[in-house]
UniProtKB/Swiss-Prot annotation:
Protein name: Fumitremorgin C monooxygenase
Catalyzed reaction equations: fumitremorgin C + 2 reduced [NADPH--hemoprotein reductase] + 2 O2 = 12alpha,13alpha-dihydroxyfumitremorgin C + 2 oxidized [NADPH--hemoprotein reductase] + 2 H2O + 2 H(+)
Localization (cell): Membrane
PROSITE patterns the UniProt entry points to: CYTOCHROME_P450 (PS00086)
The species this protein was found in: Aspergillus fumigatus (strain ATCC MYA-4609 / CBS 101355 / FGSC A1100 / Af293) (Neosartorya fumigata)
Gene encoding the protein: ftmP450-3
Alphabetical list of SUPFAM superfamilies matching this protein: Cytochrome P450
PANTHER family, A to Z: CYTOCHROME P450, P450, PUTATIVE (EUROFUNG)-RELATED
Family: Belongs to the cytochrome P450 family.
Claim: Transmembrane is one of the keywords in the record: yes
Main enzyme class: oxidoreductase
Positions bound to heme: C442
């Protein structure tokens, strides 16, 4: 037996080593030719570690490198998955194509099947409910504008005070607080929108979730269903969710009792009630429902408002024309939703900021559910994750001097019959994919637009702003601002 073991063990070692070598060769030199180049592919980068790090630190440069190749599609290894990056010219063709799944592309990347990262419904309902809830909210925005305005004013007075002296403030912290208070007012009503414990959760949940996802994704996929139980960011996230449950579930019970009461009172829209009724008795997680919507809503809106304020500090010549527009519109029409639509210069500044500095550099994610041949003959294999390059936002045929910030750009488009459809902030086009495009375009963009305008209205009417000397206003999140209360004579 000893002799047999002595023979078998080295033999098994040789076989194992050979299998590893063969596997490495297959991974490095896969069978069949790939028609798409991979921008950040490196020899002997067996687990794509170098490629992922390269994307993490130089994503924009890699994307630009891919666009400079002249190919209409190329692969890009990211820190999540490898995407087939398509130029925006394909967006119109793919936007409503059912062969490409939106949720199928996003859910695995966001790890929605893991506890603490999960969705609120079992099965397909978890992807149906958030858009339905937000669309229902959109119908109520005309009634919610005064309440949202009140919360914006309250938050600014609390954080920026009524002092007429110049003083430093943190724009990222202010904007996050504003979006948390206003969005909570829209979704959950007046009871929770000034609840400090809930607002702390609302402000930090999206970041905490992203940290937890990154921690899990740093491990091999076959270990992820187990390792998340032991990772500190995931454990902290689950504790935060439990704190949220202690707030949301009692609030839901109060809403149910009020809705079922015999008193025929007119109640404001409540996201809690809408989702509860939409579920029709199906088992669901009311807390995760709200946290999921918050996770989506906060990022885009807060990113936009921060960058617009940064642009105003970098281009102070825009502040007075914007202020005059607000004074004229609000003076003649009041601060209502229909009057917000008349703020065309403000919309132009917002959209131009978003054009040059979108929240993400690639977007409109899809997964090919089957092999798809596009109209120009490009073949997208089944199972391919695709994303769009946002390249048309720099198209000189679409935008004159596209690299230059022009706050009046989209306002002028309203005077051009050929381009008037491009002007509205909430309009999606293949040349402006910040909110996606087609049937999966972001349904929350209307709330985001209203919140951003209300915040800017209150800032322009009540404060003067300027960048702190030496700070880079083009970098939201890393710069501070000086702010002073406007006096009555200004």
């Amino acid at each position: 037996m000893e002799t047999l073991d002595a023979i078998q063990l080295p033999y098994l070692g040789v076989v194992g080593a050979s299998l590893i070598v063969i596997l490495g060769i297959i991974l490095l030199f896969p069978l069949g030719s790939d028609p798409f180049i991979t921008i950040n592919q490196h020899p002997r980068d067996l687990f794509q570690t170098k490629a992922k790090q390269q994307f993490e630190y130089n994503a924009a440069a890699l994307l630009n490198e891919g666009l400079q190749t002249g190919h209409s599609a190329f692969r890009l290894v990211t820190n999540m998955v490898t995407y087939l990056i398509l130029k925006d010219q394909y967006a119109e063709e793919i936007k409503n194509d059912s062969r490409f799944g939106a949720h199928e592309a996003v859910d695995p990347v966001l790890l929605v099947d893991l506890p603490g990262l999960e969705s609120m419904f079992q099965g397909s309902l978890h992807n149906q409910v958030p858009p339905m809830a937000v669309r229902a909210l959109n119908k109520e925005l005309v009634h919610l504008t005064p309440s949202l305005s009140e919360e914006a004013m309250n938050c600014l007075q609390t954080r920026w005070t009524d002092s007429t002296e110049w003083h430093g403030v943190s724009i990222p912290e202010t904007v996050l607080a504003l979006i948390a208070q206003m969005t909570t007012r829209a979704l959950l009503g007046p009871e929770l929108c000034r609840n400090p414990e809930w607002l702390d959760i609302a402000k930090s949940f999206t970041t905490n979730r992203a940290i937890a996802v990154a921690a899990v994704q740093s491990w091999p996929s076959f270990l992820q269903p187990v390792i998340h139980w032991f990772l500190p960011p995931c454990r902290a996230l689950r504790r935060q969710i439990q704190c949220a449950r202690n707030i949301i579930l009692p609030a839901l019970e109060r809403e149910r009792r009020a809705y079922c009461s015999d008193q025929p009172t007119k109640r404001e829209f409540s996201n809690l009630v809408f989702i509860d009724q939409y579920a029709k008795g199906a088992r669901y997680d009311a807390t995760m429902a709200q946290l999921r919507i918050i996770a989506v809503a906060f990022q885009t809106t807060s990113d936009l408002v921060e960058k617009v304020i940064a642009r105003l500090c970098k281009h102070p010549e825009l502040i007075e024309p914007l202020r005059e527009e607000v004074v004229s519109v609000v003076g003649n029409h009041g601060l209502h939703r229909h009057s917000l639509r008349k703020l065309t210069l403000m919309e132009s500044v917002m959209k131009e900021t978003q054009r040059l500095e979108p929240a993400v550099i690639i977007g409109m994610f899809r997964l090919a559910k089957e092999k798809v041949t596009l109209k120009d003959g490009t073949v997208v294999p089944k199972g391919t994750n695709i994303a769009f390059a946002n390249d048309l936002r720099f198209d000189p045929e679409m935008y004159l001097e596209p690299e230059t910030f022009d706050g009046y750009r989209f306002q002028r488009m309203r005077e051009d019959p050929a381009k008037i459809d491009l002007a509205p902030f909430t309009k999606t086009r293949m040349s402006h994919l910040a909110f996606g495009h087609g049937k999966h375009a972001c349904p929350g963009r209307f709330l985001a637009c209203d919140e951003a305008k209300l915040i800017l209205c209150h800032i322009l009417l009540n404060y003067d702003i300027r960048a702190v000397e030496g700070s880079p206003p083009e970098l939201p999140g890393s710069w501070g601002n000086d702010v002073g209360e406007k006096t009555a004579g200004d």
